[in-house]
């Protein structure tokens, strides 16, 4: 699996860091305050991203539980599918799930471009919300991007030095029809 490293396996993976921690400090502090207050006012399921390039995924919601793998890509989107105190059960784009401590997750929204596609398919990053508009870049499957906004059909994303629009159903990290502001 290209974004998880099993314990005992040394795999070099490229990192893509799209935003600094200060950009999302306000979002993260709101999320942490809600959790600290014992109010899980956040919906489950929901998408979040990894804060670090080393995130231990455990069999259960405790440091006493064994580490089953390690995520090694900061910014990777994961889906929170359950909560237990300060632990979040997350699922990755390949469907694998496990438990992660809440402070290793960020409310910053990120996406993977067609992670289910195994071919050389390229997804256009359009200059506007139209398939007839000019493509500013072609994105490979598995490219990580930051979500700027989504309207339920299109998402405006930034990838490296490029910004543009991708059809929402070509992305993992946002729900079909979801609006993100």
PLM regions and their residue ranges:
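N-terminal processing/targeting junctions
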Residues: 8, 23-24
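Extracellular/periplasmic metallocenter environments
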Residues: 156
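C-terminal segment of classical bacterial N-terminal signal peptides
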Residues: 15-23
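Bacterial N-terminal signal peptides
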Residues: 8-16
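SH3-family beta-barrel domains
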Residues: 24-59, 70-74, 81-84, 91-93, ...
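Bacterial N-terminal signal peptides that target proteins for export
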Residues: 1-9
